[in-house]
């Protein structure tokens, strides 16, 4: 079977520049969500970040005042091609409402553990809008669950849904005395990731749209994102 093309080889399928100018919704206030959100903000994008109660206050209660600062994890962030972006990312919105976060957003990043997928998806599905692209990072079969729940809830919105084999970073929320600080330390930045969409016919559009995410810039400028065969293929990738 012929290999799928990498994102760099795909003819322009989605309007990357239009997507890059649109608001981005980040669902999840943990290390992946905070780092992806701050990275996109540092790339000049409008970012809204969301976590659900009862976690919102601890995770994001002060983020509108403090922002999230990205910094190296000693001895330094590993990155093959020298990509570097550090500093304080400022958010346009921090909310405990998924509907508020995703309204009018073109790109939605789901950066939460798979155990929380169902809880977030029940809030997300009624708020989906035609034309949105959902990136589940990492997928962990979240794309399958989201499509299944959309059918069960009668959602027929025309959206692209896919997931990635891993997060674009090794990252941790810094703590002091058991209290989370407004900083995330990066151990490494990925230079390539594999992604796929459900249905598979959307995969090339899905992978191409990653070029519009600031949190994928080290990948876009590295070896590029690659189309996986199916979301099952992506789900097995971290194992």
Predicted regions and their residues:
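Internal, conserved structured core segments that host functional sites
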Residues: 62-73, 109, 224-239
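Short, aromatic/basic amphipathic alpha-helical patches
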Residues: 60-63, 146-152, 207-212
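A general structural motif
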Residues: 21, 44, 105, 129-131, ...
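Substrate/ligand-engaging "lid" and interaction regions
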Residues: 168-239
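Rossmann-like NAD(P)(H) cofactor-binding subdomain of soluble oxidoreductases
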Residues: 114-180
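Rossmann-like NAD(P)-binding element
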Residues: 81-137
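NAD(P)+-binding Rossmann beta1-loop-alpha1 motif at the extreme N-terminus of oxidoreductases
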Residues: 2-80
């Amino acid at each position: 079977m012929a290999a799928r093309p990498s994102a760099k080889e795909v003819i322009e399928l989605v309007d990357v520049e239009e997507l890059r100018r649109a608001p981005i919704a980040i669902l999840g206030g943990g290390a992946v969500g905070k780092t992806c959100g701050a990275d996109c903000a540092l790339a000049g994008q409008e970012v809204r970040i969301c976590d659900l109660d009862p976690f919102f206050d601890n995770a994001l209660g002060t983020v509108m005042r403090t922002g999230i600062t990205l910094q190296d994890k000693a001895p330094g962030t590993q990155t093959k091609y020298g990509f570097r972006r550090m500093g304080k990312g400022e958010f346009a919105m921090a909310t405990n409402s998924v509907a508020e976060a995703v309204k009018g957003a073109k790109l939605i990043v789901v950066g939460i553990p798979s155990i929380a997928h169902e809880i977030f998806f029940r809030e997300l599905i009624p708020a989906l809008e035609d034309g949105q692209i959902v990136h589940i990072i990492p997928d962990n079969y979240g794309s399958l669950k989201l499509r299944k729940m959309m059918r069960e809830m009668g959602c027929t919105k025309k959206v692209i849904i896919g997931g990635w084999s891993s997060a674009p970073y090794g990252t941790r929320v810094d703590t002091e005395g058991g209290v989370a600080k407004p900083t995330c330390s990066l151990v490494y930045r990925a230079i390539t990731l594999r992604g796929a969409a459900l249905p598979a016919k959307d995969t090339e559009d899905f992978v191409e749209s990653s070029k519009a995410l600031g949190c994928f810039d080290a990948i876009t400028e590295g070896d590029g994102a690659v189309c996986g065969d199916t979301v099952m293929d992506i789900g097995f990738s971290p194992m």
